[in-house]
């Protein structure tokens, strides 16, 4: 199953390795990653968008585990609004 996450993280060199390492340990394949440093009032932070392919079994609790990382300030799972067309 494909899952999408948006994270507000500390803009530090080890942040990407910690987040992707957690995904690897949970057997989630990172299929897309976007990292953008914050501008203006949120200096020192970055927005990290993740698209993961993970089994339901291994994905259980992934949102909570991502949020428990020290470098992660906020995490949200994004729901897909795309509808499949059968035909």
Where in the sequence are the language-model features?
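A conserved regulatory-domain signal marking ACT and ACT-like small-molecule sensing domains
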Residues: 1-87
């Amino acid at each position: 199953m494909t899952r999408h996450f948006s994270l507000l993280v500390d803009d530090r060199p080890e942040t990407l390795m910690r987040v992707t390492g957690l995904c690897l340990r949970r057997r989630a394949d990172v299929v897309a990653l976007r990292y953008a440093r914050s501008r203006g009032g949120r200096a020192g932070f970055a927005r990290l968008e993740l698209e993961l392919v993970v089994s339901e079994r291994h994905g259980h609790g992934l949102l909570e585990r991502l949020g428990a990382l020290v470098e992660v300030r906020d995490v949200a799972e994004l729901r897909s609004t795309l509808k499949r067309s059968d035909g």
